[in-house]
């Protein structure tokens, strides 16, 4: 159903409402020429404007209505008359005021003009009769109405009086508009504000619109001036006033539509109005004075349409397919679509969402069809789509291409998506997710829009934001992993040293030292009783004893040498074993390094090839293990030789030599007499006693000896703290590198979101209306949760005893900003300090960290967790009015998502939204969503199914599509379309969105005026 002849709704048209006719005094040309001028005019609406007269308008209308006119005049005239029938004519009366004012430039006697624009539905005779009653020098115009010179030069009227009379006359009330020239001939700009400011303001306040083509002047009347407040403008003008302009043509040779400058020379400007070409359409600019008027060469939206014809649906046809056999009518419609905003309205079950689904299908949406509400299995596509298959949609795009599909078809996910579709069920699902975290659909949708703002070149061939971020952070994550392995190695050494720094360990060493001291004391108590060498012996006995003693001395020296050599060999054996193991470890590391280099070659091969480079010319790695292998071989050979020397089974080994030596000593001792034997036994016992005493005393290098324990205690007092500090410093520096890499990942996020951030920063609608901000930061993610779930038990004594994990770290972490490495590491140190000391007491008693750990958890694991910084995450978060996305209500999420789809999304493809207001309150729609929609429709086709008057009417939808289903007529779905100002559409709006006029009036009567 087409409402009159403008089903596409409000579109941009050229209007010239200041065109004089031969009825104006001084006009150059006759009516035949005038009709030719009108018919060939480059404009759609023409206001025939004469001084205190509509005679010219009436004559042209007569000619259009006269059938005989089709045969009159020449061919040019007849052709122009036919063209003129497609245009709209408005009756306009130009009046002069009685007021004579002092010009602000010092000129006196200035006359002020104003225009009365009448509804063409009014009979011209009624307008003429009203004009003839105007008084001139005490008598009405009457019979002098045909005297154009008299009307031009002699008639002046009181502005307030004539407006008052028209408003009081039921025939004219709401059927005329007052147009007041401003900065043009007869305009009020010349009024001196020093003497007649009040008059000037009153004239402006009483005018419906002003005459000016100056953008600065137009902006002023739209209250767009930084010097003045909205309150000041409201006091001056009452409401915002539209500015329009006409050609002020007085000559049939003028080009109508084209505006003139102050020297009456033609310019490249036209007066464009986006409305039905009717009086009601003109009235609409009073309610939308900014968005429905453009004075210039061409409105930006028309340029947008020309440049993006592939991204606009021009028309949609839904018809029965050729093989259809269903008796039901369902669809038989042809819907021209507006390029701006289309609002689809209708009662429940009327076919609103059906049209949205069909549009989405025709545009190959990539939205999951399961979210459709009409083209689904349990509705129109039931029984394997048998019914849907009998109907087809044909979409005509503005570039001339067409898309035809059966309604049982499914969108092709591999094809080009030509429309963005947001069904009601999908929007509701995304907005009501219970855990809208980083992996939620809500976040995923936002990331898609953000990715659209990254230039094709900067996407590096990646298809999603996550892919691009992963690519750009891969090496940084590798650096973090390597650093964490290094941290773990340092922690292994550090925990070993810290275990020695405890009071328990010191006490254990002190106890071992005391035990050795007692052992040495006890050993001294059992020293051999001294036996003197026999002195009263004969010369022969003495000679025999001396010979045996000499041999015994030699054997004992041999025994001492064997013992000393055995000790040396065992030390060397131990050293060689350690060196062999070290060589093997180094060889393993070299092999690992070689494997890493090989992996680097594999991973960079394709990239280097694209750059025309070779890895070998950038990095040269030469691995030669020959010296290491030779060294390990020599060490192994030496150890094998020493193993043989120390092996008791070999005849020439040291143990075998010692056994033989002891046998010889025993044999020599058997040759001595009793006194000398006792003396030798004493010497042997004394040697063994001294040997054991030396073993007990030991040396600082021997750990389990008296001097070894003394050295360990000395190390605990002096050397150990320095070694611990050294490892802690080393660990801190590595942790700083980890933090540096995390910060670098954060900066990658920042670069990814820079384009969106710039858009948000530059958008007044987003910045002020939504208070939408991006924040780049490093955040602590679930530190307390992991710390107390995996590592620390709050059920034992200590600083965290009986504390809830959610609050346990609050008093510690609040003072630290983890965005800096120093403060992040200070935070960790404070946590460790709370584990090392019981902060619940004034004494802050020392505590063992190990005693506070969960079962099967060691201190090293805790250190790896704390110093690995795995709980620090780079985040580039979006916040709405200071709130993180995870804390937004479903309504706030819906608003934000729609803002992203509408305003932030760079795509110019049509966007179809099914009932976005379902999760939004009316105030949110009015304050936040409407400014966004009005801004976006300037550059993108928006199609919305809605039952909200705020969206359809306050957003000033250019086209309203009313859906209705006639069940009695075979389920015929009927779509009626047109502009808001269309009378039929206006009635639908009131009935459907407001619940009928009486319901609306009832509500309005009960509201208090603010």
Where do the language-model regions lie?
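Conserved ABC ATPase signature
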Residues: 336-340, 344-353, 423, 876-900, ...
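Loop/turn-to-beta-strand initiation segments
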Residues: 875, 907-910, 938-943
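Phosphate-binding glycine-rich loops of NTP-binding sites
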Residues: 46-49, 58, 118-121, 341-375, ...
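Extended, charged coiled-coil "arm/hinge" scaffolds of SMC/Rad50-like chromosome-maintenance ATPases
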Residues: 489-492, 496, 518-887, 893, ...
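Extended, charged alpha-helical "arm/stalk" segments used for dimerization and assembly
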Residues: 407-495
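Charged catalytic cores and adjacent phosphate/nucleic-acid-binding surfaces used
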Residues: 1-45, 54-91, 95-124, 185-349, ...
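Flexible phosphate/Mg2+-sensing switch loops adjacent to catalytic phosphate-binding sites
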Residues: 75, 363-408, 742-759, 764, ...
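C-terminal lobe/lid and adjacent interdomain/linker elements of RecA-like ASCE P-loop ATPase modules
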Residues: 386-388, 405-406, 414-417, 926-1010
């Amino acid at each position: 159903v087409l409402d009159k002849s403008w089903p596409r709704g409000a579109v941009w048209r050229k209007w010239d409402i200041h065109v004089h006719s031969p009825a104006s005094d001084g006009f150059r040309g006759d009516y035949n020429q005038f009709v030719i001028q009108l018919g060939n005019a480059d404009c759609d609406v023409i206001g025939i404007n004469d001084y205190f007269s509509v005679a010219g308008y009436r004559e042209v209308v007569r000619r259009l209505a006269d059938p005989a006119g089709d045969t009159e005049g020449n061919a040019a005239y007849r052709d122009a008359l036919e063209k003129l029938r497609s245009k709209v004519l408005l009756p306009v009366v130009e009046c002069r005021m009685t007021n004579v004012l002092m010009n602000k430039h010092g000129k006196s006697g200035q006359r002020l003009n104003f225009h009365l624009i009448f509804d063409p539905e009014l009979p011209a005779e009624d307008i003429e009769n009203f004009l003839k009653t105007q008084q001139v020098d005490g008598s009405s115009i009457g019979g002098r109405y045909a005297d154009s010179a008299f009307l031009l030069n002699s008639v002046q009227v009181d502005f307030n009086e004539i407006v008052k009379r028209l408003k009081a006359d039921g025939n004219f009330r709401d059927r005329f508009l007052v147009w007041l020239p401003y900065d043009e001939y007869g305009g009020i700009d010349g009024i001196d504000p020093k003497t007649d400011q009040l008059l000037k303001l009153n004239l402006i306040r009483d005018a419906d619109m002003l005459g000016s083509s100056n953008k600065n002047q137009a902006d002023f009347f739209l209250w767009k001036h930084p010097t003045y407040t909205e309150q000041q403008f409201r006091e001056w003008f009452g409401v915002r006033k539209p500015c329009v302009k006409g050609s002020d043509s007085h000559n049939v040779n003028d080009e109508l539509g084209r505006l003139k400058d102050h020297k009456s020379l033609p310019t490249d400007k036209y007066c464009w109005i986006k409305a039905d070409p009717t009086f009601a359409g003109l009235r609409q600019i009073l309610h939308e004075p900014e968005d429905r008027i453009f004075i210039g060469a061409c409105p930006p939206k028309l340029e947008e349409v020309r440049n993006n014809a592939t991204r606009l649906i021009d028309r949609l046809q839904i018809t029965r397919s050729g093989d259809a056999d269903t008796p039901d009518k369902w669809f038989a419609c042809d819907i021209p679509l507006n390029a701006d905003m289309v609002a689809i309205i209708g009662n429940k079950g009327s076919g609103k969402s059906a049209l949205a689904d069909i549009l989405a299908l025709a545009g190959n949406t990539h939205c999951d069809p399961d979210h459709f509400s009409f083209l689904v299995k349990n509705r129109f596509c039931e029984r394997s789509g048998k019914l849907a298959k009998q109907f087809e949609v044909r979409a005509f795009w503005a570039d001339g291409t067409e898309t035809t599909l059966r309604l049982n078809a499914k969108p092709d996910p591999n094809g080009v998506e030509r429309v963005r579709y947001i069904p009601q069920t999908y929007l509701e699902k995304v907005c009501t997710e219970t855990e809208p975290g980083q992996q939620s659909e809500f976040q995923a949708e936002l990331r898609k829009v953000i990715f659209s703002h990254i230039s094709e070149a900067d996407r590096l061939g990646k298809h999603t934001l996550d892919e691009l971020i992963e690519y750009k952070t891969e090496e940084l994550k590798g650096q973090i992993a390597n650093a964490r392995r290094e941290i773990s190695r340092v922690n292994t050494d550090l925990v070993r040293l810290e275990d020695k720094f405890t009071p328990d360990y010191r006490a254990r060493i002190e106890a071992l030292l005391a035990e050795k001291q007692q052992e040495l004391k006890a050993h001294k108590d059992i020293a051999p009783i001294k036996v003197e060498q026999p002195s009263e012996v004969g010369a022969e006995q003495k000679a025999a004893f001396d010979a045996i003693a000499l041999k015994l001395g030699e054997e004992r020296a041999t025994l001492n040498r064997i013992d000393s050599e055995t000790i040396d060999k065992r030390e060397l054996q131990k050293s060689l074993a350690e060196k062999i193991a070290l060589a093997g470890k180094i060889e393993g590391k070299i092999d690992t390094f070689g494997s890493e280099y090989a992996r680097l070659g594999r991973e960079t091969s394709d990239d280097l090839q694209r750059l025309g480079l070779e890895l070998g010319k950038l990095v040269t790695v030469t691995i030669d293990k020959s010296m290491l292998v030779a060294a390990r071989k020599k060490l192994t050979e030496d150890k094998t030789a020493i193993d043989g020397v120390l092996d008791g089974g070999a005849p020439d080994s040291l143990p075998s030599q010692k056994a033989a030596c002891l046998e010889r000593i025993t044999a020599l001792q058997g040759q001595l007499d009793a006194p000398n034997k006792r003396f030798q036994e004493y010497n042997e016992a004394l040697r063994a006693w001294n040997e054991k005493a030396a073993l007990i005393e030991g040396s600082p290098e021997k750990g389990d000896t008296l001097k070894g324990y003394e050295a360990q205690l000395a190390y605990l007092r002096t050397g150990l703290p320095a070694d611990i500090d050294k490892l802690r410093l080393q660990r801190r520096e590595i942790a700083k590198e980890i933090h540096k890499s995390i910060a670098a990942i954060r900066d990658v996020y920042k670069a990814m979101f820079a384009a969106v951030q710039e858009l948000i920063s530059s958008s007044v609608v987003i910045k002020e209306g939504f208070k939408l901000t991006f924040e780049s930061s490093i955040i602590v993610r679930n530190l307390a949760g992991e710390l107390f779930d995996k590592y620390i038990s709050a059920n034992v004594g200590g600083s965290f005893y009986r504390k809830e994990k959610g609050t346990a770290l609050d008093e510690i972490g609040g003072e630290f900003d983890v965005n800096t490495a120093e403060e992040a590491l200070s935070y960790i140190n404070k946590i460790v300090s709370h584990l090392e000391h019981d902060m619940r007491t004034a004494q802050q008693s020392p505590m063992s960290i190990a005693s506070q750990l969960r079962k099967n958890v060691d201190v090293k694991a805790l250190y790896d967790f704390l110093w690995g910084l795995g709980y620090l995450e780079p985040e580039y978060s979006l916040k709405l009015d200071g709130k993180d996305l995870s804390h937004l209500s479903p309504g706030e999420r819906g608003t934000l998502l729609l803002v992203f789809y509408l305003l932030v999304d760079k795509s110019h493809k049509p966007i179809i939204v099914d009932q976005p207001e379902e999760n939004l309150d009316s105030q949110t729609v009015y304050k936040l969503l409407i400014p966004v929609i009005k801004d976006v429709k300037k550059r993108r086709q928006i199609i919305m199914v809605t039952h909200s008057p705020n969206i359809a009417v306050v957003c000033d939808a250019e086209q309203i599509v009313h859906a209705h289903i006639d069940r009695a007529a075979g389920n015929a779905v009927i779509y009626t379309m047109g502009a808001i100002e269309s009378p039929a559409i206006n009635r639908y709006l009131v009935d459907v969105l407001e619940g009928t006029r009486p319901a609306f009036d009832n509500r309005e009567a009960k509201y208090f005026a603010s």
